[in-house]
A protein has these predicted regions:
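Active-site acidic carboxylates
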Residues: 1-95, 117, 146-150, 159, ...
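Alpha-helical elements of Rossmann-like donor-binding domains used by nucleotide-donor carbohydrate transfer enzymes
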Residues: 30-33, 110, 139
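Active-site-proximal beta-strand/loop segments in catalytic clefts of secreted hydrolases
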Residues: 48-51, 100, 127, 152-155
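Conserved N-terminal glycine/acidic-rich loop preference
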Residues: 96-135, 158-178
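Acidic, metal-binding active-site segment of PIN/NYN-like and related structure-specific nucleases
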Residues: 121, 140-141, 148-149
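Short Gly/Thr/Asp-enriched flexible loops that form oxyanion-binding sites at enzyme active sites
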Residues: 133-143
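Short leucine-rich amphipathic alpha-helical surface patches
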Residues: 141-144, 153-156
Length: 178
């Protein structure tokens, strides 16, 4: 089975940094477990990294969310916890994809290139469910017409009720929630 795991923006600034929140910290073990299983199964893994620059506050997103975060070259930009090891070690079945917006078409291209076509399954975990996770799930769902799209609810996080609302929207779009 051709399978990909996408770990969305599980970075220091979203866990214990500029935009950190407890729910994001509480899913660390679930994410580590999913990554470990994907490595053991030789699945393709994409770690997306929200990536901004010194001019962040001048961008559309910066005006919407005026909190500098994930600035390239800062500790907050790095992958959180044990995932930071993937920034140091080259692994043939794992890539890091820097993205400057909530969702990235390059994610679809990266997955498609890895499989020379469409995978059977694309799984998602990470943060923030109602912003970057949902954006990338919808992009992949639109791009890959036959792949099963799966979101690990217990390995995603958002603030307050936004988690529930985002999961309900994804269910309504036919995404498999596990």
């Amino acid at each position: 089975m051709k399978k990909a795991l996408v770990v969305v923006d599980y970075q220091n600034d979203f866990v214990d940094g500029a935009l950190g929140f407890l729910a994001a910290e509480n899913i660390a073990d679930k994410i580590y477990s999913l990554v470990g299983k994907a490595m053991a199964d030789r699945s393709f893994i994409v770690f997306t990294k929200d990536t901004h620059y010194d001019n962040y506050l001048e961008t559309r997103e910066g005006k919407f969310l005026p909190v500098p975060h994930c600035i390239k070259g800062t500790p907050g930009h790095g992958l959180y916890g044990m995932l930071a090891d993937f920034e140091e070690v080259v692994t043939p079945n794992a890539v890091i994809l820097e993205k400057e917006t909530f969702g990235s078409d390059r994610l679809c291209e990266t997955i498609e290139e890895a499989f020379s076509g469409e995978p059977d399954v694309i799984e998602f975990c990470g943060v923030v469910t109602n912003i970057c996770v949902i954006s990338n799930v919808i992009l992949c769902q639109a791009h890959f017409k036959n792949a099963e799209i799966v979101v690990h609810e217990d390995a995603t996080a958002a603030l307050g009720d936004m988690q529930h609302y985002a999961i309900e929207v994804l269910k309504g779009l036919g995404v498999k929630i596990v």
